[in-house]
Amino acid sequence: MLLLGGGAIALPAQSGVQVTPMAQAILLASRSDPVPLGGALNELRVVQPILTLDARALRGLLIGTGTLNFEAVTMPGGELSSAVWGEGFVDRRHPHTVVHELNIAGVDLLGGLDGRGRIGVVLGKGFVPFGTDDPMSRWLSRYPVNHHLAQIVERAIAVAQYDVGKVTIEGALFNGDEPERPDQWPLIKQQDGTWRFGDSWSARLTLRPVAGLELQGSQANAHSPEHRPGAGGDAVKSSVSARWKDSPHWGERYLLAEWARTSELEGTFVFQSVLVEGMLRRGRWSGRFRLERTDRPEEERLDDPFRSRRPHLENSILGISRWSLNTLGLATDLARPGGMLQLMLFVEGTFGQVKKLDDGIFDPIGLYGTTSVGELRIGFSAGWGMRNHRMGRYGVLASAHADHDASGMSNH
């Protein structure tokens, strides 16, 4: 076994095969005020503990991606995080499935027959080609409120890609249902013979007009995402974004602006999000920010006020809230910036407002006792090789346009 540059491992018994291990985890102390039923809450947890293997063969024409996520062990009750929601959790971020990604991609299937173009295919489990990068591979430890509006995660996917020059087109079929618990796999086919896989689709166009700039537009239709048996309605989703990332001699710069929209029950419920975030690093110190305004469905909650009913139908939506939040962060590298090992101390503060957006019965004063939102997070992150990984970028995007200077969450 031979360790190559960039952390890749060459397997001598299988010439041309390289395996790149990546890992990260964050020890996080947080305080949220308010929480459901009023008051404040403090927590100490390990969040985002993952192990990823990137395997490449046939000179990079065959790429395998596998990621294990251990949040089911370190945060089975979710991560305290005001306004965040999804998969039956509210004001807590849900633990991801244990097998977070497991897929294989073929790149440039036609070789030189299609000229400068390259055709790719991705099969397995992972991120649907829709929206922006997963927050786990971005600069703030806190997930945005719009995670389930701006990304579609942990599905069985069949993706076709075409890449030529500065343009990449992707189309995918996937199962509409999202996971209900960390050990659950995507539902491929129901007992009555109805296929869940293939009942939903997405398409994404990515443009790279100049070095460092990436423009993205995508559309998706997810069938019954919150009702696994498929009795729910469709979620029609749209996303547009612009991303800038470069690395001048003195450090790094990053900026993302995105708009996302999800419509349910043919426009009966519409949720929109606008988000801008950025980072500036000079030497060992970096500052980061996020400005977000996102609409959230207010669902029927259980006796545990941090949990909502599953399986979920649209008639369980009690209203729509709008969260306008601002997050500022400061971090310092304890290891050499740009190296494979990442060790970082960080602090993040979030403040903002929540308001009722429609005529539903949801009342923020009644639930939280206030419309003001505040959160403080102090953490230590450790990682290996995560700078080279933009989670959810498969096939032709992983092989030719991976952002090898992009930071993973080990750079909090």
What positions do the PLM features span?
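Beta-barrel outer-membrane channel/assembly domains of diderm bacteria
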Residues: 9-109, 373-377
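Transmembrane beta-strands of outer-membrane beta-barrel pores
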Residues: 25-31, 57-61, 68-74, 125-129, ...
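Surface-exposed coil loops of outer-membrane beta-barrel proteins
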Residues: 28-39, 77-103, 109-206, 313-317
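Residues that define the transmembrane beta-barrel architecture of outer-membrane proteins
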Residues: 43-49, 95-100, 152-158, 163-165, ...
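Residues on the lipid-exposed face of transmembrane beta-strands in outer-membrane beta-barrel proteins
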Residues: 49-57, 102-106, 158-164, 171, ...
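Repeated loop/turn-to-beta-strand initiation elements of outer-membrane beta-barrel proteins
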Residues: 60-64, 111-114, 119-121, 129, ...
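Detector for outer-membrane/organellar transmembrane beta-barrel domains
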Residues: 164-168, 172, 204-320, 324-326
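Outer-membrane beta-barrel "beta-signal"
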Residues: 368-412
